[in-house]
Amino acid sequence: MSLTAAVFLACFVTGLGLALFRNPIYGLYTYIAVFYLDAPNRWWGEGLPDLRWSLLTAGVTAIAMLRLKPDPDRVPWHKTAPAVFFIAYTLWLWIQSPWALDPEMHRECAIQFTKFIIVYWMVYRLIDTPVLSADFLLAHVLGSFYLGLLAFTSNVSGRLDGVGGPGIDDSNTLGMH
């Protein structure tokens, strides 16, 4: 295992431990790190165990969030306009799955939107102050900087396929991100 992989693994375990025993926000930060670093597809991640890193992070964060008491002054997450839209659209995707023209791509899309709902729930429940919003946005900026650094140092001419992480590994979705 490379030194980079060992550091990633140590930070991953630390982030999940902090999420469970201190504050679930660390699980969300770990999720962002796993998304942007995309360890299984990097040269330094070859020695890491074959895990569903994002799923494990989301599961641990969800378990850690169970101890949070709902804020009586906030609208429940599922009653916000974006959540209603996401839920309705995702349900519609699953309903129309049997007659989709490209069942495999349609299934991937439905799964992706289901994941968006879970991440939306986590972000809505955990990011509740301006300081946490700034920290969350900073984590995204740092992740985007890392992807930009990978793109800049890659030996790819033309389209940047394979530079991004999970779900953004082709040049079109990476560009949208």
Describe each PLM feature range.
Residues 95-96, 154:
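Structural signal for alpha-helical transmembrane segments and their membrane-water exit/capping regions
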Residues 115-123, 145:
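Transmembrane alpha-helical segments
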Residues 37, 51, 95, 111-114, ...:
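Residue-level micro-sites within transmembrane alpha helices that shape
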Residues 42, 108-110, 125, 131, ...:
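Membrane-interface segments at transmembrane-helix junctions in multi-pass inner-membrane proteins
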Residues 13-14, 119-120, 161, 167:
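Preference for short coil/turn "hinge" residues that link or interrupt alpha-helices
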Residues 1-95, 101-104, 108, 128-141:
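Transmembrane signal-anchor hairpin modules in multi-pass inner-membrane enzymes, especially those
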Residues 44-46, 117, 152:
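Juxtamembrane helix-loop transition sites at the ends of transmembrane segments
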Residues 30, 56, 119-120, 149, ...:
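A general structural signal for well-ordered alpha-helical segments in protein cores
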